[in-house]
Amino acid sequence: MSETASWQPSASIPNLLKRAAIMAEIRRFFADRGVLEVETPCMSQATVTDIHLVPFETRFVGPGHSQGMNLWLMTSPEYHMKRLLVAGCGPVFQLCRSFRNEEMGRYHNPEFTMLEWYRPHYDMYRLMNEVDDLLQQVLDCPAAESLSYQQAFLRYLEIDPLSADKTQLREVAAKLDLSNVADTEEDRDTLLQLLFTFGVEPNIGKEKPTFVYHFPASQASLAQISTEDHRVAERFEVYYKGIELANGFHELTDAREQQQRFEQDNRKRAARGLPQHPIDQNLIEALKVGMPDCSGVALGVDRLVMLALGAETLAEVIAFSVDRA
């Protein structure tokens, strides 16, 4: 394909036909299991507080809003879907566009397709099994293996991530030639993420999908803390052939705790010189009413299609990557 022919799609038509078949297969998977498909807004007056996510911001100008109203493109449909759970919708899934103002590259596009679903009365392990079922059905891959975050660090880096201090983490980073970044980093979780990215991820999910679960409690995000070990959160991620595919939680249902976590995120943002983000008070109010105990997961569909088709880049499986949009 000519580099100057920017009008052309980034994906071939055969790839788009295969992608459509995979989307239909995903919908059949959930229809067969009685999971309701829903659609929620792509824009909201609130957004994520996570220091590692950069949302797009826009302004609405219309009747009653002559001065404009700030809106954010959704990085995930999570908050709206949880409000539906509180309203009594039962198990739900969504295939939707999500937006993150981050890098563009082999595995990234600022606009992408997300598959997200929630299962009331499922614990983390039962949802992991369902994710495994979906991957086997779509990718025709072997059944997944699982190991804890702690086991992964001990196996590949010979360090315990739950007890190591920052000095010990920097020593391991030096062995990975990461001292130029690690030596000036004061946030322990950022150091852990650095080691996970460069020391663990390249070693897992080579032959079969790999679940990594029980991330440190300090990285809980919207997940519950384990009742068996308060050092870890009921959170998992899935990796296959060098690609992070999904991130799942045994969902936090405590409104007060969720408010505190959002506020803590904003304090971290301020400390790093990042803008603080508006907290989604509609979600907090919904949690006060009571969300059923549930587990949920977000899966990158474009990456899933990449794996299914054996493509090398995301651009090969989406109609128009951002440089051709």
UniProtKB/Swiss-Prot annotation:
Its EC number is 6.3.2.-. It catalyses: D-beta-lysine + L-lysyl-[protein] + ATP = N(6)-((3R)-3,6-diaminohexanoyl)-L-lysyl-[protein] + AMP + diphosphate + H(+). Changing E102A: No effect on lysylation activity. It holds the Pfam family tRNA-synt_2. GO terms for cellular component: cytoplasm; cytosol. It comes from the Bacteria. The keyword Manganese does not apply. GO terms for molecular function: acid-ammonia (or amide) ligase activity; ATP binding; lysine-tRNA ligase activity; protein homodimerization activity; protein-lysine lysyltransferase activity; tRNA binding. Changing N247A: Loss of lysylation activity. ATP binds at R100, N101, E102, N109, E244, L245, G300. Disruption phenotype: Cells have a reduced pyruvate oxidase activity and a reduced growth rate. Cells lack CadA activity (lysine decarboxylase). PROSITE patterns: AA_TRNA_LIGASE_II. It is an enzyme of class 6 (ligase). Substrate binds at S76, P77, E78, Y118, E251. Changing E244A: Loss of lysylation activity. One of its GO terms (biological process) is lysyl-tRNA aminoacylation. Homodimer. Belongs to the class-II aminoacyl-tRNA synthetase family. EpmA subfamily. This is Elongation factor P--(R)-beta-lysine ligase.
